[in-house]
Amino acid sequence: MSIASNSTVIILGSTGSIGTQGLDVISRHPERFTVTGLAAGGAHIELLAQQAAQFHVSEAAVFDETKVPALQAALAQAGAQGVRVTGGPDSVIAMAGSGANVVLNGITGSIGLEPSIAALKAGSQLALANKESVVAGGHLLFSAQVRENQINPVDSEHSAIWQSLRSGTHAEVAKLVVTASGGPFRGWKRADMENITPEQALHHPTWNMGPVVTINSSTLMNKGLEVIEASRLFNVPPERIDVTVHPQSIVHSMVEFVDGATICQASPPDMRLPIALGLSAPDRMTNVAAACDWTQAATWTFEPLDDEAFPAVQLARHCLAASEKHTAVLNAANEQAVHAFLEHRLPYLGIVDTVKAVLDQMDAELRGNPLFTDVEEMNQLELEARRRADDLINKQ
């Protein structure tokens, strides 16, 4: 679907990394976009108010409804007028489903699924950075589409694959190759990781991301989730998806075709590029991000993934092959473990170990009906996975 020349846009997770960079892209193209609504968790109320004032939005929502009075006060302080303030998860879902031309979903976590579904059902084009929507509730998400090609992937890897797939038909695809920077601990062995601190893990060598995604990138769980997402978004089985470590983060992913040709998308690491394409596809915008400088000597390297040191990708592959419910448990247990690590309640190696232990506990009960019947069933399973993760964490 071609986006209208002056598109209405709603941004979910506007104060996070994806949201702030999305607004930066939009600010450079005021003739193309009108931001009508912003939603955020509630941790950065002043920033949300400033964004609402700058973009003259009609509605601002916070997941944490106890922050509504603070947001109202901050909006007044920022000089924002006529902004309707709403609070609670239902208000964010309602905003997502209000019928904007484009909804950019930059929410972190599976709480982003219901807003994604609402946006699709309302006919909006969904610029999706919330990979958990696909990982935890894939078929619930896809069945909400009211037309083909309603989802524009915003993750840099999936945007790269999406662009590269234009070079051939689906039948001509031999494999997808997802690239990984390797994170801050590339080259480390498992024994070296026992005493890693949150401060160390939050220092990513190439990307500027939120804390949960940054930790996931360091454990390579993020790459595992991306393999799941790529398989489901592009209908390619997991055995035809490879992962390669590319420390320079210039090649964002590749598609190998049956004739031996490999097509990639390459650019300096800057999330504004996939965000911009997610907002405007199939058209491209000017003045988005820097291109590669081909006048300068450069070396791009690729190396195999060390599955022994970073078992998260193999664990994700196992869950992808098992069922949608396995991938939902993987995601929920991981979110719980990452938060515990950030709060210094769980050692670094305990993150993936906890996730595997929860999956081992729940494996038998997950092997009935592999698909969720509705979001409530998914939510209940995730709650159980989080509870079991907490039990294991508290025993550390």
Curated annotation (Swiss-Prot):
Pfam families tied to this protein: DXP_redisom_C, DXP_reductoisom, DXPR_C
Keyword Metal-binding included in the entry's annotation: yes
Signal peptide residue numbers: none
InterPro entries named among the record's database cross-references: DXP_reductoisomerase (IPR003821), DXP_reductoisomerase_C (IPR013644), DXP_reductoisomerase_N (IPR013512), DXPR_C (IPR026877), DXPR_C_sf (IPR036169), NAD(P)-bd_dom_sf (IPR036291)
Cofactor(s) required for function per UniProt: Mg(2+); Mn(2+)
GO terms assigned for molecular function: 1-deoxy-D-xylulose-5-phosphate reductoisomerase activity; manganese ion binding; NADPH binding
EC top class named in words: oxidoreductase
Residues binding 1-deoxy-D-xylulose 5-phosphate, per UniProt: 131, 156-157, 181, 204, 217, 222-223, 226
Disulphide bridges, residue numbers: none
Keyword Manganese among UniProt keywords: yes
Function: Catalyzes the NADPH-dependent rearrangement and reduction of 1-deoxy-D-xylulose-5-phosphate (DXP) to 2-C-methyl-D-erythritol 4-phosphate (MEP).
Name of the protein: 1-deoxy-D-xylulose 5-phosphate reductoisomerase
Phylogenetic classification of the source organism: Bacteria, Bacillati, Actinomycetota, Actinomycetes, Bifidobacteriales
Name of the gene: dxr
